[in-house]
């Protein structure tokens, strides 16, 4: 008799197997019991008959509490009525770990209660489906970039400078020096691009933002490619190809998870159609003003403006060439306009706003020094970064994509906290 995982049930129809499971739920009519069993790979139904198990064993089985762990032995049968397509006719079982008063029951719970019990909530069907989609997106990220000749480099988490030049930093003592939890791996990524041509960093980043919006976490994962010898137009092509690739990967490999989340696949499929529309910041301002928005040139867009623009185009949309005053110091100046930089944000529809921000990077040593000084930065902190412009600088571009924002859009979640295993937010660092 073989020990299998539920996900492989199709390969063992009409065979007797053994599976290690947790009991998610159960119901019994007195002579027959239906048990929802999960093993981490999938969930399906186990069926136990009183006249086959015997009265004592049947009573013990039907008395088991939610989240009891056990070995079950039985025969796999195809079942077209089951969402999974298969069920287990249980002939034997062995309790491994008991469970008493499991706090997350089928009834509704408030979000604070669920987050306090996140270590257990991950077992429930919706969080479980989201984490599986997260895993698929991460897998597809590596596949996308590896297939295109990118090298992954690992940027440090502890840094002595801030790439965005902000004050939203987690500060710590580093043997008598000030150090910060990284907000971005981008500057190190640029160094990597000068060594390897095309690179990506992918890891946790930290923002000490005292924000309670549905789009912010204090710790999140960010994907940041940097590409030498590449201008902005070419970078935009990489960005839209990436989004379409990741969306298609989820459609192809996570149909059950999308069904659990009630995510419409046809809508997702529409978002894989390329190219994405492009609109200049100037034209976006004009469009917003024509539709009743009180916005002036030079402001950064908030959630209402981003939502309108993406819904107007009914697709992810690139907004190009933002005002220099609202963008980071490292962005390439526009060739004909002093007030604009060659930057772009990708806005997702359905109210999710910016999911990618990118730009062509400045290659001008003196311009970068001027921008750093204007933002109040200490040039000594950035000496190594400025060195990149002194020794064979080339045109290069890059972008950043927040994994959790992307996942919130793909899985249609109201808050990014749903898309990371253990969210870190203002006033929440437990569990």
Swiss-Prot record:
Keywords: Aminoacyl-tRNA synthetase, ATP-binding, Cytoplasm, Ligase, Nucleotide-binding, Protein biosynthesis. It comes from the Bacteria. It holds the Pfam family tRNA_anti-codon. GO terms for molecular function: asparagine-tRNA ligase activity; ATP binding; catalytic activity, acting on a protein; nucleic acid binding; transferase activity. Its main location: cytoplasm. InterPro entries: Aa-tRNA-synt_II (IPR004364), aa-tRNA-synth_II (IPR006195), aa-tRNA-synth_II/BPL/LPL (IPR045864), Asn-tRNA-ligase (IPR004522), Asp/Asn-tRNA-synth_IIb (IPR002312), NA-bd_OB-fold (IPR012340), NA-bd_OB_tRNA (IPR004365). It catalyses: tRNA(Asn) + L-asparagine + ATP = L-asparaginyl-tRNA(Asn) + AMP + diphosphate + H(+). GO terms for cellular component: cytoplasm. GO terms for biological process: asparaginyl-tRNA aminoacylation. The keyword Endoplasmic reticulum does not apply. It is an enzyme of class 6 (ligase). It is found in: Cytoplasm. Its EC number is 6.1.1.22. Belongs to the class-II aminoacyl-tRNA synthetase family. Homodimer. HAMAP family: Asn_tRNA_synth. This is Asparagine--tRNA ligase 1. It comes from Lactiplantibacillus plantarum (strain ATCC BAA-793 / NCIMB 8826 / WCFS1) (Lactobacillus plantarum).
């Amino acid at each position: 008799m073989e020990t299998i995982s539920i996900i492989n049930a199709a390969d063992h129809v009409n065979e007797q197997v053994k599976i290690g499971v947790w009991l998610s739920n159960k119901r019994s009519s007195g002579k027959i019991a239906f048990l929802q069993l999960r093993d981490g790979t999938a969930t399906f139904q186990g069926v136990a008959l009183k006249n086959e198990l015997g009265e004592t064993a049947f009573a013990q089985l039907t008395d088991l509490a939610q989240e009891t762990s056990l070995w079950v032995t039985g025969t796999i049968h195809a079942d077209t009525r089951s969402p999974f397509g298969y069920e287990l006719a249980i002939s034997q079982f062995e309790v491994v770990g008991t469970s008493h008063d499991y706090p997350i029951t089928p009834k509704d719970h408030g979000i604070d209660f669920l987050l306090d019990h996140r270590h257990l909530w991950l077992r429930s069907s919706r969080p479980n489906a989201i984490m599986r989609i997260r895993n698929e997106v991460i897998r597809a990220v590596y596949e996308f970039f590896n297939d295109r000749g990118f090298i992954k480099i690992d940027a440090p988490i502890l840094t002595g400078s801030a790439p965005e030049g902000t004050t939203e930093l987690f500060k710590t003592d580093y043997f008598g020096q000030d150090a910060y939890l990284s907000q971005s791996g981008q500057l190190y990524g640029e160094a990597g691009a000068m060594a390897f041509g095309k690179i990506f960093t992918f890891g946790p980043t930290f923002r000490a933002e005292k924000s309670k919006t549905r789009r912010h976490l204090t710790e999140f994962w960010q994907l940041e490619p940097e590409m030498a010898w590449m201008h902005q137009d070419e970078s935009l092509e990489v960005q839209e190809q990436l989004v379409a690739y990741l969306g298609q990967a989820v459609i192809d490999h996570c149909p059950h998870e999308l069904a659990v989340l009630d995510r419409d696949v046809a809508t997702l499929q529409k978002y894989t159609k390329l190219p994405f529309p492009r609109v200049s910041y100037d034209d976006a301002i004009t469009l917003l003003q024509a539709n009743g928005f009180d916005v002036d040139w030079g402001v950064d867009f908030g959630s209402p403006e981003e939502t309108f623009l993406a819904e107007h185009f009914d697709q992810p949309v690139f907004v190009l060439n933002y005002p220099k005053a609202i963008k980071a110091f490292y962005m390439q100046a526009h060739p004909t306009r002093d007030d604009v930089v060659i930057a772009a944000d990708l806005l997702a529809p359905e109210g999710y706003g910016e999911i990618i921000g990118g730009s062509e990077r400045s290659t001008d040593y003196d311009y970068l020094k001027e921008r750093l000084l204007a933002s109040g930065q200490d040039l000594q902190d950035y000496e190594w970064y400025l060195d990149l412009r002194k020794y064979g600088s080339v045109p290069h571009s890059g972008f950043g994509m927040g994994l959790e924002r992307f996942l919130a859009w793909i899985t249609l979640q109201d808050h990014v906290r749903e898309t990371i295993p253990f969210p870190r937010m203002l006033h929440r660092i437990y569990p």
